[in-house]
């Protein structure tokens, strides 16, 4: 089974973990937040906003269009640091991010 075929279920698992946590947001950030030029939109969005509103949709769009996927992916370290010390239950989300990163190491 190709990596691309396994990526979409991993993205859905990340979304499911995000929805099951208190981090899921029902309101889209302001349009200006999407104009960021910074990695992870760190200057305009929280990590969970970037994951929900930027990363997941862009990855699905790449898969839908058949466009090349990133050769490497390592977003888990960012989220481990960003969520350090938070009281939210993010364990399952971090687990699913770890799974996705591992798919890009194959």
Model-derived features: positions:
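Alpha-helical scaffold segments that form or flank carboxylate-/histidine-based iron centers
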Residues: 36-49
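Mid-chain, well-packed structural core segment of small domains
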Residues: 50-82
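Hydrophobic alpha-helical packing segments in soluble, helical-rich domains
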Residues: 14-17, 44, 51, 55
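N-terminal intrinsically disordered, cationic/polar leader segments
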Residues: 2-33, 37-38, 76, 88-97, ...
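Short, low-complexity intrinsically disordered segments
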Residues: 22, 48-51
